[in-house]
Swiss-Prot record:
One of its GO terms (molecular function) is DNA-binding transcription factor activity. GO terms for biological process: abscisic acid-activated signaling pathway; gibberellic acid mediated signaling pathway; negative regulation of starch metabolic process; positive regulation of photomorphogenesis; positive regulation of protein metabolic process; regulation of gene expression; regulation of long-day photoperiodism, flowering; regulation of seed germination. Its main location: nucleus. Coiled coil: none annotated. It comes from Arabidopsis thaliana. InterPro entries: Histone-fold, Histone_H2A/H2B/H3, Transcr_DNA_Rep_Reg. Residues 1-35, 209-250 are annotated as: Disordered. One of its GO terms (cellular component) is plastid. Disruption phenotype: Altered response to abscisic acid (ABA). The gene is NFYC4. Residues 214-225 have a biased composition (Polar residues). It holds the Pfam family Histone. Residues 227-242 have a biased composition (Gly residues). This is Nuclear transcription factor Y subunit C-4. Signal peptide: none annotated.
Amino acid sequence: MDNNNNNNNQQPPPTSVYPPGSAVTTVIPPPPSGSASIVTGGGATYHHLLQQQQQQLQMFWTYQRQEIEQVNDFKNHQLPLARIKKIMKADEDVRMISAEAPILFAKACELFILELTIRSWLHAEENKRRTLQKNDIAAAITRTDIFDFLVDIVPREEIKEEEDAASALGGGGMVAPAASGVPYYYPPMGQPAVPGGMMIGRPAMDPSGVYAQPPSQAWQSVWQNSAGGGDDVSYGSGGSSGHGNLDSQG
């Protein structure tokens, strides 16, 4: 009996089904190829689009700073100083206005209009449109913190409807713009410019003498309509009636 018990206790262990030295691995089936690629591709497209927009805005402000530092003509302006003065005097507490104040206000209004236009145009490009609409301006105001004082006058319903429509299509409202439809703001000739893009022109200067390349046809039509449609506002760099000297507008 004792020998039998010893033999039973000394039985060899069962042979492993795996070869010696091999590691046991669990085979996990790969995820569906469609869903992962869509998520990754969409995130990359969105990130690339944000980088493009930030680059365009940085170029715009870099050029504006350079232009402000080099300005030496304080008599001709993009916006009529008479209108600026009239708005400033609408405040009953304002009794007198110095000669420099309307000039600074005119430049500030010009920069405000230009930046808001650029941001609105970017939204139009995201939605693959070549026409600037009021919902593009509303979207630019809603997206930008410094424009939050205009939120109360933004048609929020139109933005919500557009975002819902984009979400239903699976685009999330962000579509990569075409390579030829990216609005770049080009510096004057003689300064480095980023090639391969369009630009947002300025109405008060001759594009052939200022920009490295002529503006796009879309922006040409916008500026031409603005220049020909106003009653009092004149978009000329010369001494037109819309921008008179400070002496003549006092």
